[in-house]
């Protein structure tokens, strides 16, 4: 087995291998210091930035959810308040309607009572005027009867004539 590289025409030089190994280690150290370090720093910064963006997005999402919930609560309160206002307006309208109806009824009763009073007053005046006319007619009839001594038929005719006169004078 140790003869295999010699048979193929390959020879191993320990110094070359050591030199190449040393050069490789130096190259890796330089890459780590100048390329891998900054690259890892950039990747770390990118990772931190993405994590920060995710955290910020989650916080904004939570804030948005809170705002949505607050808006729902405010909307619910506004609906309840508007419903209360509508109910109060309906109650006030009903109350005013009842007050107007009561006022109209009271006014109607007042007008009826005033009309009744006026009717009674006019009736009393008419009765009084009628009594005066009857009294004056009675006096006139009595004076006519006294002036003339009339039989029953003549008296009836005289009364009818006076009643016609009274009817025409009205």
Swiss-Prot record:
InterPro entries: ATP_synth_B-like_membr_sf (IPR028987), ATP_synth_b/b'su_bac/chlpt (IPR002146), ATP_synth_F0_bsu_bac (IPR005864), ATP_synthase_B_chain (IPR050059). It is found in: Cell membrane. One of its GO terms (molecular function) is proton-transporting ATP synthase activity, rotational mechanism. The chain crosses the membrane at residues 15-37. It is a single-pass membrane protein. Its main location: membrane. One of its GO terms (cellular component) is plasma membrane. Keywords: ATP synthesis, Cell membrane, CF(0), Hydrogen ion transport, Ion transport, Membrane, Transmembrane, Transmembrane helix, Transport. The keyword Transmembrane helix applies. NCBIfam families: ATP_synt_b (TIGR01144). F(1)F(0) ATP synthase produces ATP from ADP in the presence of a proton or sodium gradient. F-type ATPases consist of two structural domains, F(1) containing the extramembraneous catalytic core and F(0) containing the membrane proton channel, linked together by a central stalk and a peripheral stalk. During catalysis, ATP synthesis in the catalytic domain of F(1) is coupled via a rotary mechanism of the central stalk subunits to proton translocation. Component of the F(0) channel, it forms part of the peripheral stalk, linking F(1) to F(0). Belongs to the ATPase B chain family. F-type ATPases have 2 components, F(1) - the catalytic core - and F(0) - the membrane proton channel. F(1) has five subunits: alpha(3), beta(3), gamma(1), delta(1), epsilon(1). F(0) has three main subunits: a(1), b(2) and c(10-14). The alpha and beta chains form an alternating ring which encloses part of the gamma chain. F(1) is attached to F(0) by a central stalk formed by the gamma and epsilon chains, while a peripheral stalk is formed by the delta and b chains. The F(1)F(0) complex interacts with SpoIIIJ and YqjG; YqgA is found in the same complex. This is ATP synthase subunit b.
